[in-house]
Amino acid sequence: MDKLEAVTGVGQDSILEVRVKLVDSEPEIWRRFELRGSLALSQVHQVLQAAFGWEDAHLHRFVTSDPFAPLRPVDGEIPEVPQWLPQQGCEEPGDKPEEDCSLDQLLALGHGEAFYEYDFGDSWLHRLELVSRRSVEEGTSPARLIDGARRGPLEDSGGLPGYEEIMDALDDPGHPDHAEHATWVADMTGSDEPFDPAFLDIADVNRTLAQLL
């Protein structure tokens, strides 16, 4: 048993039902997965990238609590908050390699929840919530998307405020920025087809996940 396993009590593999939402999105952008608890966080990163339509073009991290919530002093000092990053990005004392921590271990440390931040500029913050667990059955996929709503925002759209502004302009042909934003969206998506923020192809996501893991 390794040190992290001893702390979390996590050992035997399970299938975890995990709900992931993009924090503060309205209407809510969310996904519900069945994931093996033994998946390394580096693999969970790949799953979230595929499911939300990200392009893995920016930095990311996992943490056990909201990274933007005020911290309470402990014995008069602000506690160090650990974060899990790709091994090559670990530079600070609280940085831990995401390759060495499993999803089950992270959720145990966070008492059933965790956060994944992608793109520290736009700051796309995802909240992971453990819904249930069951034993692993033969032939169970390591990662499967079972439900969700709405496509993920476009890369480099300026966080949720910027993305919502772009969507508002697209939805209003009379908006002064409609043409500019329509051109930008077409460039980003590589398509002149109308952009539908409500679209989500679960089957396509699962095909991608099957190739990744």
Regions found by a protein language model. Give the residues of each.
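Short linear regulatory motifs enriched in tryptophan with gly/pro/ser
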Residues: 1-213
